């Protein structure tokens, strides 16, 4: 647990009206706010050690192992507002390193970060802001991952798909040649391979380069080998966060029916949505070729009303 930089090893982290669990999990994991608030209220721990201890009182089926979630680590040290508005100062960086060091000694798997561009916060006034891990610099990650590297643990992340060169630069953190010791790195993402048929070659090429004798890395890409089925209620789905128009729609409160109707009947919004939706489907690229020949762009299964 603790993937995509999100987790609960610091408890609810509620301070001064802030709800980090609700703010971070709602839109990324598609969980209703009322459910998350009940979960936060039930948390009796506020540190990584007590989080592990609480499992002793649960009737568990599978084994549980946890990453330290980077977004929650930033919030724990800097506070929610600061974690999405500025870089940490030296004392804050040292505090994050100290907490991470303690977690590694407790047996945590490593550090989890996130680079997907459609992971947004859900509470006002931050609905246009992404989760805290995405505001971290290369320097911050290098310092935190040096702790993970020292303990021979794992860096779990999702690729920075907006900028391939930046993603490649960040993935060099796996290199033992550049940073003294190889860092086990797991990069995970769900993709439609039919929409990007050459992506597997790109991933394998990057891994081959970084894991070569020249750079001595330990990078492994993970992808689901089957259909990725997502259940959602209408437009409310993390997958629709990719478009700025639908992200604006999802940012409204779930039960704000009137607000959604106003937005969907706004001519400017309608035009923007149509432009974004048709992008890549009306030209001479692969997506357009696929659509013209009737190949599925995506599969929507509607549950019959009971």
PLM features: residue spans?
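Polyanionic/metal-chelating signatures
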Residues: 13-52, 71-72, 81-95, 104, ...
């Amino acid at each position: 647990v603790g993937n995509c930089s999100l987790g609960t090893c610091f408890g609810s982290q509620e301070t001064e009206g802030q709800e980090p669990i609700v703010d971070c999990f709602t839109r990324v994991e598609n969980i209703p706010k009322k459910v998350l608030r009940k979960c936060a209220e039930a948390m009796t721990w506020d540190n990584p050690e007590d989080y592990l201890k609480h499992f002793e009182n649960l009737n568990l089926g599978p084994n549980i192992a946890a990453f330290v979630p980077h977004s929650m680590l930033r919030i724990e040290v800097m506070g929610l507002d600061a974690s999405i508005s500025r870089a940490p100062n030296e004392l804050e960086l040292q505090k994050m390193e100290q907490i991470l060091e303690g977690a590694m000694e407790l047996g945590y798997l490593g550090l989890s970060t996130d680079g997907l561009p459609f992971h947004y916060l859900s509470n006002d006034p931050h609905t246009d802001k992404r989760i805290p891990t995405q505001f971290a610099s290369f320097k911050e990650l290098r310092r935190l991952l040096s702790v993970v590297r020292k303990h021979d643990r794992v860096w779990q992340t999702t690729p920075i798909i907006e900028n391939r060169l930046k993603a490649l630069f960040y993935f060099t953190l796996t290199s033992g040649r550049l940073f003294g010791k190889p860092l086990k790195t797991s990069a995970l993402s769900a993709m439609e391979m039919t929409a990007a048929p050459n992506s597997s070659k790109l991933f394998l090429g990057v891994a081959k380069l970084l894991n070569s004798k020249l750079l001595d890395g330990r990078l492994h890409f993970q992808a689901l080998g089957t259909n990725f089925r997502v259940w959602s209620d209408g437009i409310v789905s993390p997958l629709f966060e990719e478009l700025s128009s639908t992200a604006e729609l999802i940012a409204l409160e779930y039960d704000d029916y009137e607000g959604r109707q106003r937005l969907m009947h706004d001519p400017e919004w309608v035009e923007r949505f149509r432009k974004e939706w048709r992008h890549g489907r009306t030209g001479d690229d692969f997506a357009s070729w696929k659509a013209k020949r009737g190949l599925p762009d995506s599969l929507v299964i509607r549950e019959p009303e009971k």
